[in-house]
Amino acid sequence: MFKDKVAIVTGGAQGIGMCIADEFRKAGAHVYVIDIQEGPHYVGDISRKETLEAFAAYVLERHEKVDFIINNALPVMKGIADCSYEDFEYALKVGVTAPFYLVKLFSDHLADAASIVNMSSSRDRMSQPQTESYTAAKGGIAALTHALA
């Protein structure tokens, strides 16, 4: 079903992202993972514009079209008491800005019937104390998803 399809997964070094990447591979897809953690994937900080541009170039050197973009990377989860301005800004860059920019970078290279999946959370509507940075990022990705649709 996914033979020779191209899938991009952010935050795919562990957890849900790793499971998604593994399932795409099992189904025959070419999978490109980007994660800040070291490993056998493209290593980079997606909060950085230059990293996203280099990653997109890396993928597009190998494939003309992309079939799936899975924006899964986990933003910082800190509460207002412990979250610095820089932490909050980083959470929004990872959780909202990077997904926006990846879609923009690949927009001219999406295959017919391509899919973009942005991992959100019910946390954007049902917040918990000490998770304000995560909650804001998940609210942002939900709004971006709606706008892109």
Where does each model-flagged region fall?
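Active-site helix of classical SDR
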Residues: 103, 137
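Residue(s) in the substrate-gating loop at a strand-loop-helix junction
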Residues: 121
